Swiss-Prot record:
Its EC number is 2.7.7.60. It comes from Xylella fastidiosa (strain 9a5c). Gene3D superfamilies: Spore Coat Polysaccharide Biosynthesis Protein SpsA, Chain A. GO terms for molecular function: 2-C-methyl-D-erythritol 4-phosphate cytidylyltransferase activity. Pfam families: IspD. The record marks 157, 213 as: Positions MEP for the nucleophilic attack. Disulfide bonds: none annotated. This is 2-C-methyl-D-erythritol 4-phosphate cytidylyltransferase. It catalyses: 2-C-methyl-D-erythritol 4-phosphate + CTP + H(+) = 4-CDP-2-C-methyl-D-erythritol + diphosphate.
Length: 231
């Protein structure tokens, strides 16, 4: 993988679902903010040449880092939604990032992406006409619930995947799609959805389950366990 890419990390969320007074991306994990692990995991790949972190307006928790692993680390202010923050980050990328360049978008609270998974995403995504996302096939049995909470049926899972990040797409296509979705009042839940709305079909690249997102306190405990295994 020789093509250099920038990564956009939306980190303007307040972590309301987590239930902490501190946004979860800044929660201390073994003495360091959670987001530091995320940034280091991305910067560890030689093809990642810079990172753009999108923070909330007036964010006092951000420590004004300017580099990670010797790579430039820039910041900009985000929006009310994740999609708005991603758009802000894409528009704020430096001039060295061209319209047709591939860009990674990665959750700030997903600190455990494996270098091997990142490598496979970049290899497959940059060779694909649209791009690619990391994902995990659904392996559990899925039940459809009725309005009263009882089971209405069982859903086939053979072609269902759980979307993870990073997600890799061309900058111009993401910008255009996010702008159109905002104008149409569409709630965007991930970058692949932006491509789908343009009639495009991104590639699914399977990754490890350990690339989970920190959403609950139990997830944080799980990540601390993963860190202990590295020692």
């Amino acid at each position: 993988m020789s093509v250099g890419v920038w990564a956009v990390i939306p980190a303007a969320g307040r972590g309301v679902r987590f239930g902490s007074p501190v946004p979860k991306q800044y929660l201390p994990v073994v003495g360091r903010p959670l987001i530091v692990y995320t940034l280091e995991a991305l910067a560890a790949h030689p093809a990642v040449c810079g990172l753009m972190v999108v923070v909330a307006e007036g964010d006092l928790a951000w420590s004004s880092w300017t580099e990670v692993a010797g790579k430039p680390l820039l910041t900009c202010s985000g929006g009310v939604t994740r999609a708005a923050s991603v758009l802000s980050g894409l528009l704020a990328l430096p001039q060295v990032v061209h319209a047709d360049d591939f860009v990674l978008v990665h959750d700030a609270a997903r600190p455990n992406v494996a270098l091997s998974d990142l490598e496979r995403l970049l290899e497959a995504g940059c060779a694909h006409p649209v791009g690619a996302i990391l994902a995990v096939p659904v392996r559990d049995t899925l039940k459809r619930a009725g309005a009263d909470g009882s089971i209405d049926g069982t859903e086939p899972r053979e072609r269902l995947w759980r979307a993870f990040t990073p997600q890799l797409f061309r900058r111009s296509q993401l910008v255009r799609g996010l702008q159109v979705a905002a104008a149409d009042g569409i709630e965007i839940t991930d970058e692949a959805m932006v491509m789908e709305r343009q009639g495009l079909r991104p590639l699914l690249v399977e990754c490890a389950e350990s690339n989970f997102k920190i959403t609950t306190p139990d997830d944080l405990v799980r990540f601390e366990f993963e860190l202990a295994r590295r020692v």
